[in-house]
Structures are given as C-alpha cells and as structure tokens.
Amino acid sequence: MKLNHRILLLIAPVILLSAAASSYIIYTSQKNALLKRTDSYLQLNIEKLASHYRQAQSLVSSYAFTLAKSDIIRHYFSLEKNPYRELELVDNLRETLQILQPNEKQLVSLSILNGHEELLYYAENSSDPFAELDPKVMAYIKQRFASTQKNSDISYTVNSAGEDILVRYDMLDTQTLSTPLSYNRQDVFFVVVYVVLEQFSQLRKKIEFDNQSPIFFTHSPPSYRTGLLQSVELQPGFYAILDPAPKLINAQLHSIQRELLLSFGVSALVTVLMLLLLLYRHVINPILHLDKQLEEVENNQRKNIEKLNTDDEIGRLSSRFYAMYSELHSTYQRTKALAENDHLTKLANRYQFQVQADLLLSRCYDTQHIWVMYIDLDNFKYVNDKYGHQIGDSLLVSFATHVRQLCKNFEASHNTYSIAARLSGDEFAILLVSPKRFNDCAKIFAQRLLAPIQNKDNSPLSHFPITASIGIATFPKDGEHIEKLLLNADTAMYQAKNAGKNQVAYYSQALDQIVQRRNNIERALRLGLFDQEFNLAYQPYFTCSGKRLVGFEVLLRWQSELLGEVSPEEFIPIAEQTGLFGTIDRWVISKAFQEISTLQAIVKEPIQVSINLSSAELNSLKLAQFIHRQAEQFGVSPAWIDFEITETFAADSQSFPLLHELSRLGYGLTIDDFGSGYTSITQLVQYPVQKIKFDRHFLDTLIATNKQNVIRPLIDLCHSQSMKVTAEGIESETMHQWLADYECDYMQGFYFGYPMSLSEISPWLHASNHKKKSYAQDHYCFTEPSQSECR
C-alpha cells in the first residue's frame, strides 16, 4: 500500500474526533470584537486630540485678532514721538496676555516683528522677566513665510525644548493695521502668537505610549486605510495619523489563542498520542532512520545514505537524496577547487595561500627554516598588450608549471615543503619550509626559479622579453604573520626591480628604511608644497673658450621641512612613476618664466635658459598650451628658451606631438644625456632638435677607455646637421681643452660654475669678471660662438 493511502486511513478518524473547527470559529469571533473595540477607543482618543488642537487654534486666533483690532499697536505706530510708547506697548502686551490667558500653566507668547522679520518686542506669560523669543520659533517663522508667502498663517511645530507649539503670524500694514495690498518691508510688520500645546502634547504622548507608535503629522490624508490606522484633520490641509504597533493587538490575540489552546490542548493530547502511536511505526520510524543517515552525511561520517528499495514515498525519497548527495559531493569538489585555486594556473589563490600559510606558521618548529618569496614578472603587461591575452595567459601557465615542478623537485631533493600561489595578475608567492641544515635553500630555489629566464633556455619563458624579480622575507625575523611576511617580501621584490630586475633581494631593515623614505617622498610630493619648499638653481654654460656666457640651465632643488634636502635623483623618478611630475613641470616652467626678466636684468643682456621636460609629459599637447600662456603672461620670447629631453625618450620623438608643437612655436629643443642611450645615426639625423648635450658619464667613459678621439666625428656629424653641441660635467682644464680642441660649441660644469640661486648670480658674475681681467677688455660677452673661437 502506498504511503499516502496508509496515512489517510490512519489520520481520518483522528481528524473527525478532534473537531478543531469549533476552536477556529470562537477565535474569529473574539478577534473581530477585539478589533472593533480597539478601533473605537483609538478613534475617540484621536478626536479628543484634535479637539485640544482646535481649542489652541481658536486661542491663538483670538489673541491675534485682539491684537490686530485693539488700539495697542495702533497707538504704538501713531505716537512715534512718544518716548514711552515702547514701554506702553510691552505693558499692554503683557496685560493682554493676562486678560486672555485661559490657563495659568499654558505658555502663550506675543511678538512683533518688523518688515525685515526682525524681533521688535516680545512678551510671554511666564515668570521670567528676561524671557526671549525662542530662536527656533523665529527661524521657523522666517522659513514658513519664505515658503508660503502668505500674509497670515497658522501651523504646528516644536520649540527648542521639544514642546509642541501652535504658531500664528499675521502681516499687517503699519498705517491701516490690516492686510497690506503689497509687500513692502518698510510699511509692514508681523504679529506673531504662539502657544505651547500642553494638553495636546500630554494626550499625544499618552496615545503614543499606549500604542507604542508615534503620531505623524502630514499635509495630505492617508491614501488608504489599513488595520487600525486612524487619521483626523486638525486644520485644513493638516492631518494627524496614528498607526498602532501591530504587536499590541497581536499580544491580545495571542492571549486569546493561549486560552483556546489550553482548553483544547487536553483533548488534542489524547488525539496526538493516538496518532503518534500509529504513525511512529508506519511513518516516523522510517523517516527518522533516513534523517539520521542524512545527518551522518552532513557530519562527514559517511559519504552517502543507504538507498531503500521499498516501493513507497520514503523509498523514492531516499533514492532521490542519494542521487542529490552524489551530485552535491561532485559539485562541492569542483567548487572547492575553484574557490581555493587560481582558475588559470591551478595554483592556490591568495586566500587559500594565506589560510594554509597561517596554519603552517602556527605549527612551525625550531628545526625548520621558513621563507616567503614574492615574485613579479617584469614587462608582463607589455607582452600581454603587444602579443595578446592568449600569449599572456600561456606565459602565466608556463611559469606556474615551472614553479610547481620546481617545488616538487625540491621536496624530493631537499626534503622541503612548499605552498605556491598566484596572488594576482603577474604576481606569485611561494612559502618554502626546509630542514635547519639547508641554510641556503631559498637562495638555490630562487636561482633555479630564474634560470629559464636568465639563461634563455628552450622554454616559453625565454621567447618573450620578460624577466622576474624576487623578494624574500624570513620567518620569524621579518614577520611572525603571513601578512607581514608578504608585505616585507613585496618590499624586497621592489628593491630587486629597482636594482635592475631579473634578480633576487632579501628584506632588511635598511631596505625598509629606503622604501619608507620613498613613501615619505611620495606623500610629501602629493602635498604640493612647491612654493614653500621648492626653489630653482641656475648653472651657467659657456662657449668653448669659456670666455662668453651663453645661458643657464634651470635645476630644481627641494629643501623639505620633514625630509631635509631631497636630491632630484631621488624625487624625480618617484614623481614620474606616480604621475605627479606634470604638476612639478608646470611649476618649474612658471617659476623660470617669472624669474627670467630678473635673470636678464642681472646679466644685462638677453640670456638663454634651458629647462628640462619630464619624459612623462612628452605626449601632452596641453603642456604646450600651458607654456605658451605662461610665455605671454611673463613676456618671455620663445627664442630665449631651450627645452631639454633625455636621449632615451627623444628616440621616439615622432610619437610625441609636444616636441613638434614646441618647435613650431619657436622654442629650442635639446637632446639631453646623449650617449646614455642607444641612438642610431639615422635617428640622430631625423631628430627635430637644435642642440645635442653629451652625457657626463659618456665623456668620463671615453676618457677612462682612452677613446677621446671618438668625440670628434660625433661633433662633426652634429655640425653637419646644423646642431650645436654642449658638453656637461666639465670639471677640469684638461677636459675643457680636449673638447675645445674638437670644436665643442658649449661647455657646462663645475669648472665654469656651480648651480646658484638667483641672488648668487650677481656676486658670481662680479667674481668671474675679476678673475678674467687678464683677458682683453670686454671679452666677457653674451653672443653665439664662432668656429674660430674654438680653434
């Protein structure tokens, strides 16, 4: 027999004996009576509340009408020459309050405002002789008049003490004491009356307390009525709404339910016992058995339930549960793998790595070494963008495979335990645990990790221009928790990048100080205190003879209040990497243009000024527009200015519209640090520049390798392209003479002059002229060099 048939035959006699329908009928009847009685009570209270409100409204209106129609105010405005009119007005206002006061405890206030809504006089029926108009009421009157623009208005609000009040104002003409025909602040005044709604407030609080629900005040009636909701119109367009808390009526209904349940509980108990006795054997026991098996599955005490072969609902239910748990187990294993592992590389993800690492660190032993390695694939974004995401993904998979295989090899050869993970993008982490006897295990592991990239082995990793930088942190010296170890390993990794990439760096306190200083520099740059802490220095450069001053190179100096002196070698790369150098470039250009007139006044001739441009700004036409505006503002001729760009970025000048725009506007362009990059002869010929500046290290290298004669053909090539040549870093007479013999056009270096502030240039010029007194008179001039001068 089917289970549903068997249950029907077993429970039908019990249902007939219970006769539960009678209890439902009784409950419904009592519920309706309770709701009707409660509704009547609430309606009576809300109407009583409205009655108090209307009484107060009548009181306020009577005060306002009495004042408007009485001679009190008329005498005040008509007897302007009476010196006692103000005292009489105040006395009359207080007398009016006492005459019309219906209740000594009820606070009533009378005020007169001028046309500018400023308080003239105030009186109230309190015992405080220094009472003043409540500022919240004053603000409300102004807001109410501004929003309604009515000549007369009565409305409800609360004062600063949180008391319910009813406020009425009437705008009257000072001459007619009636409603003005037009609004002129000089000819009108306001009569303001407000009364504290004590009875209204007491009743409202009692209703709210009894019903555990606030009374809402609104300017529109409720759109529909639900439950015991009550509403009453206090005045035209102003309603009070009460929606009692359902739990109050529900509590009373629950009380009725409990009484009914108690009365029918005894009779139902016998019925339940009979049902349980019958159902236990035929229904409950099989279900309990199934439930126990399901619980064991949930507690991982068994993999699945036993399938029942009975031909009934419980048998089919057990079969379906069996199939469902089989599918759930399979899905759980797949989901667990996705949640704990990176879907692309199949390595652990960041979350799983931290969970496993925390567990491992909590169980570490003194006989073990533990390292955390942070690995970043250098240039991966470039490869991913240039060759496509498919190539990028394959590189990540290849690197992950290499990491996984290396971990297995070390487990076999060095008895290590490792956890490898892909943290994000091109960043990986490895936690390596080795026995105490292997002190250099992390170093060997890192070297083998880099081997396919460094040695260009026959591996997918060697087919593309990517490298890897590795930072290593040691437990517990560099951190006792995985978060700290990862952070410090990341810091070491960035040090490896800064040292040239494709290498390994260990975390240390000194390294942390370097990183901390870099962060401090970045934070200080973001504050933008350029005018307070930045200043310009000017280093002169001369013709090849060293007799004629040609111009000055603008150099940026930073004296930070917090960091002390910060060299350009420190803060310029940080500014470029963080995108802040655009602001610094603009500050330098603006400051140099501002000071150029002073500079020329000092040297008494038009002078050339060279300004370095950040490589990060070379693709911005907006900078050219800024330069043009600054030049117009400070009266700077483009012919006075040279902009210097580094050789490494000048090689791609065709892609930098800024250079072509500056050249079009008439500014000079110079390739700075020539010799530090890899410029071909073709590129040198094609450069849209007028000057070449040889790098100091390039010149030092030629001297150190005894290849000084290499400089002559380079200078001749530049001259053949109508380019001037500047040599920087001249620090000795020998170096000066070498370059002068090869007809280098301009010289710059400590041999001729140090970087100076604007105020130091004039004394320096005077000292330089004094030293050069052995030359012919007036040799010190400011013209372009002739070729004969260098011979």
Curated annotation (Swiss-Prot):
The UniProt entry's GO biological process terms, in alphabetical order, are: signal transduction
Q: How does it sit in the membrane?
A: Single-pass type I membrane protein
PROSITE patterns with a match to the protein in the record: EAL, GGDEF, HAMP
Disulphide-bridged cysteine pairs: none
Q: Does the keyword Ribonucleoprotein apply?
A: no
- List each copy of the GGDEF domain by range: 368-509
Determine the domain of life of the protein's source: Bacteria
| Parts of the chain on the Periplasmic side | 24-259
Q: Which residues form the HAMP domain?
A: 281-333
InterPro entries per the UniProt record, alphabetical: Biofilm_reg_signaling (IPR052155), EAL_dom (IPR001633), EAL_sf (IPR035919), GGDEF_dom (IPR000160), HAMP_dom (IPR003660), Nucleotide_cyclase (IPR029787), Rev_trsase/Diguanyl_cyclase (IPR043128)
Which residues does the entry place in the Cytoplasmic compartment?
281-791
Positions of the EAL domain: 518-769
Q: Which residues form the signal peptide?
A: 1-23
The record lists the membrane-crossing segments as 260-280
For this UniProt record, the keywords arranged alphabetically read as follows: Cell inner membrane, Cell membrane, Membrane, Signal, Transmembrane, Transmembrane helix
SMART domains found in the cross-reference section:
EAL, GGDEF
Q: Which GO cellular component terms are attached? A: plasma membrane
Spell out the Pfam families in the cross-references. EAL, GGDEF
Where is it mainly found?
Answer: membrane
Subcellular localization, as worded in the UniProt entry: Cell inner membrane
User: What function does the entry list?
Assistant: Plays an essential role in the maintenance and the formation of the three-dimensional structure of the biofilms at the later stages of their development. Absence of mbaA promotes the accumulation of larger amount of biomass on the surfaces at later stage of development, results in the overproduction of an extracellular polymeric substance that accumulates in the matrix of biofilms. This yields biofilms lacking the typical structure consisting of pillars of cells separated by fluid filled channels.
Name by which UniProt lists this protein: Biofilm architecture maintenance protein MbaA
Q: Which organism is it from?
A: Vibrio cholerae serotype O1 (strain ATCC 39315 / El Tor Inaba N16961)
- The encoding gene is mbaA
